[in-house]
Amino acid sequence: ATMNSFEQINKIIDNEDLEKLKEEVQNIHIDKELEEYIIDIIDASRNPKDYDLDELVDIIQFGASPRATIDMFKAVKANAFLRGNDYVSPIDIALIVKDTLRHRIILSYEALAKEINIDDVIQKILEKIDIP
């Protein structure tokens, strides 16, 4: 693929339609319990002891930031929209949580030395927090 190949890109949506789609995604309903579930997942990455995840205290150097919560809300709404729903379900969270958090949780050097997988860390968090 060369730079010349960009000349053949066809426009499939205009700005007005894109803005309408963004508004539709923003209007996807997310239940308060699911919002709390997402907040707990993010918080558990920063404060594992508060969630009885003592084994992760020395493994997680930096948990996901509060900004990750906002991005997770956006991602689950987008996923619900792409699945044809006008509401977020626990399935939407399950489908995107690892992809959303994988680069936001920084493992400690100890964890890296032990070759601990970030997906396993996220899974441990998910297993401790009840799905609404």
Question: Where would I find each of the regions flagged by the language model?
Answer:
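C-terminal engagement/docking regions of AAA+ P-loop ATPases
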Residues: 47-132
